Amino acid sequence: MTAWVGLTGGIGSGKSAAAQYFADLGVPRIDADAAAHSLTASDGIALPEIRRLFGDTVFDTQGLLRRDILRKEIFASPSRKALLESVMLPLIFSEIKKQQETFTDAVYGIVEIPLLTEKRQFISLIRRVLTISAPLEKRIGRVMARSGLTRGEVADIISHQASESERLLLADDVLLNDGSLKSLREKTMLLHAFYSGIFASKPTQGKHNG
């Protein structure tokens, strides 16, 4: 039975880079954001309900979801955000579970869930939580460099996410990503050895009993 580690962290923490390093080591990787994207891609199963709830204005003439418009709408309205989540979260949960069932021989796998702290229902899918942590200024700088967003825009996004202390309270394990990519890779390799050891001997190891 494959044990699953939930990998999470705030924007700019380096969680996707860490998840990729695990994958490079042969660890099964499931990405909640990628699952969400597939559900809302052309002919995605979430589209009919999104159209029913949000109307035609969030779709283009080809029937494709206008993600930028939908993003602005839910960012401006907590109730609209909750409405979208009522559609998406159960579908994402089911998709992750379906993907997990395709891996039966691996000792452990990684599920990258950015909003794990905010959406605790996903904890039932995992055994341990790995939080990728980084100093605030480094996070802001990384996001600005890759996105072109202003400092204020990045800070606004961070303010709408769970706090670092909330993520750390949920964590079984913490990886501090305060250096280079080489350092991050080395820390990931150490965690890989740790997880391979504990899950080989005790597949249910961890305070989260997914």
From Swiss-Prot:
It holds the Pfam family CoaE. Pathway: Cofactor biosynthesis; coenzyme A biosynthesis; CoA from (R)-pantothenate: step 5/5. Residues 4-202 form the DPCK domain. One of its GO terms (biological process) is coenzyme A biosynthetic process. One of its GO terms (molecular function) is ATP binding. ATP binds at residues 12-17. GO terms for cellular component: cytoplasm. It catalyses: 3'-dephospho-CoA + ATP = ADP + CoA + H(+). It is found in: Cytoplasm. Its EC number is 2.7.1.24. It comes from the Bacteria. Keywords: ATP-binding, Coenzyme A biosynthesis, Cytoplasm, Kinase, Nucleotide-binding, Transferase. Belongs to the CoaE family. Catalyzes the phosphorylation of the 3'-hydroxyl group of dephosphocoenzyme A to form coenzyme A. NCBIfam families: dephospho-CoA kinase (TIGR00152). This is Dephospho-CoA kinase. It comes from Neisseria gonorrhoeae (strain ATCC 700825 / FA 1090). The lineage of its organism: Bacteria, Pseudomonadati, Pseudomonadota, Betaproteobacteria, Neisseriales. The gene is coaE.
